[in-house]
Regions:
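Non-catalytic nucleic-acid substrate-recognition regions in nucleic-acid-modifying enzymes
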Residues: 1-132
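A short, flexible beta-alpha/helix-coil linker loop
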Residues: 102-104, 155, 298-302
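Short beta-strand/turn micro-motifs composed of small residues
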Residues: 12, 251, 333
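Short, charged/polar, Gly/Pro-enriched secondary-structure boundary elements
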Residues: 46-53, 154-157, 371-372
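SAM-dependent Rossmann-like transferase core, predominantly class I methyltransferases
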Residues: 147-183
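C-terminal edge-of-domain segments
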Residues: 136-152, 363
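Conserved S-adenosyl-L-methionine
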Residues: 170-285, 302, 307-310
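C-terminal catalytic and target-recognition region of SAM-dependent MTase-like enzymes
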Residues: 279-282, 286-372
Length: 372
């Protein structure tokens, strides 16, 4: 590790770390290490900027700042005061501290946060503010304290374009990783027949155009002394790719379609996105060329009564089986019983992953011929 380099920990939805690793390696990051809940890399501030700006599947980018053993609060106080906080944070810039304690002699997370906060305040003449974008995270596990800086600010699923959401939204980061699971690379048509606010369709369109995920938002690292605006501008210059494909969504709810159109316009992908009002039974392939259907139907835990959803899933399965021959199909659901109700023969079922507090899986198949 060179003097200007440090450890960077990039988190994602647990269960999809392998897809995040692939994306990070495609970005050209080196010294990658797969871990539970994310990927570790070694790099400098340019890598922090790039990973925040370009990665579609990442949840947060954390900068590892210090690591040391502690067994009591006075020791934590002493070690925290010795750290070079001025290299990480600005003088008199408000900040906040969060601490998690696991299997350690120090077990009071609030008291630990207070010690670290005082060290920063004493060094930088800065005040702690719960509303600050600058978050210092401490993890004390088995008496090892690791201090990191959240360089992202708001979660990276917040792309900066969405003004309207539906009843059961899927996070943009999860949509991007599931698109990768479907082997989408920007050269296939994508259709979501229950598109809600258009997340899956818009993610697919952005990928096809090569648009960076974070191009419409700000990040916490912009408030650090290490940030160089001109260097960042050079690092994030990108020309959109030319793409002749269109990406499609439909929904029976006219309000959802209007939201999708608004969101696509704000994301600047409205020219290659098409949305229309349609029931599942009335759904037809948007193109003659087969592509990918990726759909996040309602599940009983979030929208509606589970019993009423069986008919919906049955209709979805029949429609896909009869009309979407040669299409790749991915269905996201929390309920194996509802997946079974489609009548489709699934070739692969993903790990269980979290979607807004609900455990879901991706059920994949290819419609080679009518299956029902």
């Amino acid at each position: 590790m060179r003097p200007e380099e440090f450890e960077i920990y990039i988190t994602c939805v647990p269960g999809l770390e392998d897809e995040l690793l692939n994306e990070i390696q495609e970005l050209g990051c080196k010294n990658t290490k797969l871990t539970s809940g994310g990927v570790e890399i070694v790099g400098g501030w340019h890598d922090v900027w790039r990973t925040n700006y370009y990665l579609r599947g990442a949840t947060k980018v954390l900068v590892r700042f210090a690591s040391f053993r502690v067994v009591h609060l006075s020791q934590l106080d002493k070690r925290s005061h010795k750290l070079d906080w001025e290299k990480l944070l600005k003088f008199r810039k408000p900040f906040k501290v969060e601490t998690v304690c696991r299997k350690s002699k120090i077990y009071h997370s609030k008291a630990a946060s207070q010690r670290i906060s005082k060290a920063i305040s004493d060094k930088l003449d800065a005040k702690e503010d719960p509303n600050s974008m600058i978050l210092v995270k401490a993890r004390i596990a088995s008496d090892l304290c690791t201090i990191s800086l959240d360089s992202s600010g708001e979660g990276l699923h917040k792309r900066g374009y969405k003004t309207a959401t539906g009843k059961a939204p899927i996070r943009e980061t999860l949509a991007a990783l599931f698109l990768r699971k479907m082997k989408f690379n920007g050269s296939q048509v994508v259709y979501d027949p229950m598109c809600g606010s258009g997340t899956i369709v818009i993610e697919a369109a952005e990928i096809a155009l090569g648009l960076p995920a974070g191009r419409q938002r700000n990040f916490a690292f912009m408030e650090l002394p290490s940030f160089k605006k001109n260097e960042y501008k050079e690092l994030t210059k990108v020309e959109p790719k030319k793409n002749k494909l269109k990406f499609y969504g439909s929904d029976r709810d006219t309000g959802a379609i209007l939201n999708s159109i608004k969101n696509a316009k704000k994301a600047n992908v409205e020219t290659i996105c098409r949305f229309e009002t349609s029931s599942i039974s009335g759904t037809t392939p948007p193109t003659q060329e087969p592509g990918i259907v990726l759909v996040n139907p309602p599940y009983g835990k979030r929208v509606g009564n589970r019993k009423n959803l069986f008919a919906l899933y049955r209709t979805l399965g029949q429609t896909l089986s009869e009309k979407f021959v040669d299409w790749q199909v991915g269905i996201i659901t929390s309920d194996p019983g509802l997946a079974k109700a489609t009548g489709l023969k699934f070739l692969d079922i993903s790990n269980t992953v979290d979607n807004g507090g609900i455990k879901v899986q991706l059920y994949k198949t290819k419609i080679n011929h009518p299956q029902i």
